[in-house]
Amino acid sequence: MSQQLTAVSARRGLEVHKFGGSSLANASRFQAVAALLKQQPAVPWVVVSAPGDTTDALLLLIASYQRAEDISQPLATLSTQLQQLVTATLPDFAAAAVLTALNSWLQQIPGWLASEQTNEVLAIGELLSATLLAASLTEQGTSAVALDARDFLVFANKEPDWQQSTTKLGALIAGHRSEKCHVV
């Protein structure tokens, strides 16, 4: 898979950056990553992990729910931590849209858990990182768009369907051609 992606990247002149959770653990790290990407001459693609220990917190939330424990307090704690990350990273006017999305995702957690949609819960971390980094880049003067990989990645028999995924990605980014950076 990585060889195929590398070959496609080299052929098309794509530049892909990957930032893990520790690179996005706090507001200063988000701003540093945005500053680094802003300096890139090519149109970069960025793949991000959940910020800091967010995935661990979401996994603990899932485990607590599965043990029939009350999740209201750990969910409130996680919500506060993530909201603080957003407000520390962005000015108020830019943070508002990210907070709206974050609060929507967090409010859906109990329903997702009740219907055993744990992947939806776990996706929150990456969605937040992509949304927050794109907003941070835009705030620093680099047009960026956050993309949800679930909107274009297609799997067949637990393997990526590259043809369908490429078609869906092409359609998805057609409306975002002016963006300098795509964050997934």
Give residue ranges: language-model regions.
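Nucleotide/pyrophosphate-binding catalytic subdomain
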Residues: M1-V184
